[in-house]
Regions:
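Amphipathic, hydrophobic secondary-structure cores in small proteins
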Residues: 8-9, 19, 24-37
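Structural motif
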Residues: 2, 24-26, 59
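Residues in well-ordered beta-strands of folded domains
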Residues: 4, 28, 43
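Generic non-transmembrane alpha-helical segments
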Residues: 14-17, 21, 51-56
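C-terminal structural segments of small proteins and small subunits
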Residues: 31-33, 37-62
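N-terminal acidic leader/helix
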Residues: 1-17
Length: 62
């Protein structure tokens, strides 16, 4: 799944949070969509990753 943000700084903040929680993730280019997101996003297979970012605005693309 891809976790997309409107801000690049939030992508790198989320990456740090997930790595500290030992959740495997990586920063990748954002898939092309109808909406405007920043150019990179988080890619992970861990569904629980969303729980660590409850104070951040994001959307999930599957």
């Amino acid at each position: 799944m891809h976790i997309v943000f409107f801000s690049t700084s939030n992508v790198f903040r989320a990456e740090e949070i997930l790595q500290e929680a030992n959740i495997e993730c990586r920063v990748v280019p954002t898939p092309v969509q109808d909406k405007a997101y920043c150019g990179v996003c988080i890619q992970t297979e861990c569904e629980q990753a969303k729980e660590f970012m409850d104070d951040m605005e994001f959307e999930v693309l599957e």
